[in-house]
């Protein structure tokens, strides 16, 4: 069974999140706070939210530049006026502030040298993210608007009175501290932090490999039962 088969099954059955069967160390909470205290967070996607900020522990710089300085590149290269062919990827200086988070990311199943943006995401008290989805023209054109494997969203610290939910059904993603999900960002979704604390999440892009595919199958069976694996194996691709 491939991750494409799992993605197709989730799309067909309107499954928009899959909890990752893996432990996230609590030290990531303290390191997210340290990144905040050091002043690394920058405003993210003007117009899509209020109090929504980001800082990259792994990102890109213009080719030939020092990758450690790419922490403020929180969008794709074209969002910063660069092309894919004109950038180098690597760990940023935030890795020195969050060494255990970096260590965990290095141990997380991934293809060597294929990570893209790895970002701390902050939603400040009273902050909100407006109704949107993260698909693009290519995904839409290829019928892949819905894509459970498109991104991984980790909740390092999830205050009470704080949600990320589908816009249509108002169903909330069941975040708790130190939990992670494959999240279908092609679904229209919105977020609100009604608490008086910072919400610290982390979004991962890139690195899919066979070991992560195995983790995806394992997580799917834990959430929906082993019978679903047989169902997916028997479906037409």
Question: Where do the language-model regions lie?
Answer:
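Non-heme Fe(II)/2-oxoglutarate
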Residues: 1-110
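Generic structural motif
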Residues: 23-27, 123-126, 157-159, 207-211
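Structured loops at beta-to-helix junctions and adjacent beta-edge loops in soluble globular domains
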Residues: 55-63, 72-75, 123, 157, ...
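Intrinsic-disorder/low-complexity, polar/charged segments enriched in Ser/Thr/Lys/Arg/Asp/Glu/Gln
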Residues: 15-19, 149-151, 201
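Catalytic core of Fe(II)/2-oxoglutarate
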Residues: 158-237
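Short glycine-rich, low-complexity/disordered patches
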Residues: 41-53, 111-121, 229-237
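Catalytic core of non-heme Fe(II) oxygenases with the double-stranded beta-helix
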Residues: 104-181
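Short, flexible, solvent-exposed loop/turn segments with mixed acidic/basic and small polar residues
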Residues: 5-10, 140-142, 193
């Amino acid at each position: 069974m491939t991750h494409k088969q799992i993605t197709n099954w989730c799309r067909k059955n309107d499954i928009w999140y899959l909890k990752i069967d893996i432990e996230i160390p609590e030290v990531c909470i303290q390191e997210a706070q340290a990144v905040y205290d050091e002043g690394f967070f920058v405003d993210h996607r003007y117009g899509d939210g209020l109090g929504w900020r980001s800082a990259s522990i792994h990102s890109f710089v213009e080719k030939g530049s020092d990758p450690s300085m790419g922490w403020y590149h929180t969008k794709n290269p074209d969002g910063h006026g660069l092309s894919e062919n004109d950038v180098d990827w690597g760990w940023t200086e935030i890795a020195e502030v969050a060494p255990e988070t970096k260590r965990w990311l290095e141990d997380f199943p991934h293809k060597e040298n294929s990570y893209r943006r790895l970002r701390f995401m902050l939603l400040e008290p009273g902050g909100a993210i407006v109704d949107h989805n993260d698909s693009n023209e290519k995904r839409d054109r290829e019928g892949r608007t819905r894509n459970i494997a498109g991104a991984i969203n980790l909740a390092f610290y999830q205050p009470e009175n704080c949600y990320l939910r589908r816009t249509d059904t108002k169903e909330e993603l069941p975040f708790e501290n130190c939990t992670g999900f494959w999240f279908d960002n092609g679904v229209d979704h919105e977020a609100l932090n009604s608490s008086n604390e910072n919400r610290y999440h982390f979004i991962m892009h890139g690195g899919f490999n066979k070991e992560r595919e195995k983790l995806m199958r394992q997580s799917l069976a834990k959430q929906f039962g082993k019978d679903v694996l047989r169902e997916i194996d028997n479906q037409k691709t």
